[in-house]
Amino acid sequence: DYLLELFHGPTAAFKDLALQALPRLMALARERVAPGTRAVVLAATSGDTGSAAMRGFRNLPGFRVLAYYPGRGISAVQEAQMTTMAGDNLEAVAVDGNFDDAQAGVKAAFARARGGLPPGVLLSSANSINIGRLVPQIVYYVHALRALRRRGALPPDAEADFAVPTGNFGDILAGYLAKAMGLPVGRLLCASNRNRVLADFLETGVYDRRR
């Protein structure tokens, strides 16, 4: 068995790998497609996404980040990472509720935006609904396969199984997309903590958003 180390980013969260790339990709896209506009990036977070998104977009011209997190249920360290991070374009907002309530607020903002935004303003997300979050995550599945083969730990024609600690399914979805693209991935094991939200959903077909 091998462990893929994804904690070497600036906030020590695995999401740093995608959220260091995403701001630069979005800055290039804005420059080419909508120069002179301002982008507001919303993030619903249970802790890690917020600080990683804020760190990635920190002081990036033309971008403002609003990270919404549950006022109860995240660790003091996670909250401190967001609320003490220096940056002229960053704001962390506590929501009275859980992660799903924070996410519902972000989704509602996108729904309202369909009615129109002020001129020169764009709205985007730092969550996994943004394909720009998932694409960089696909890369480290490819990297893992290559590293195993370079070490001789995986025969050239063999598949690799991945066990992925899973909260909101984004990371394991990147693995599924990598497999769909032809990467020799065998089983994708959805590892859940004692909250069991996804584990219960996969076993029963019922999703309990109250947790």
Regions found by a protein language model. Give the residues of each.
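PLP-dependent amino-acid enzyme catalytic core
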Residues: 1-211
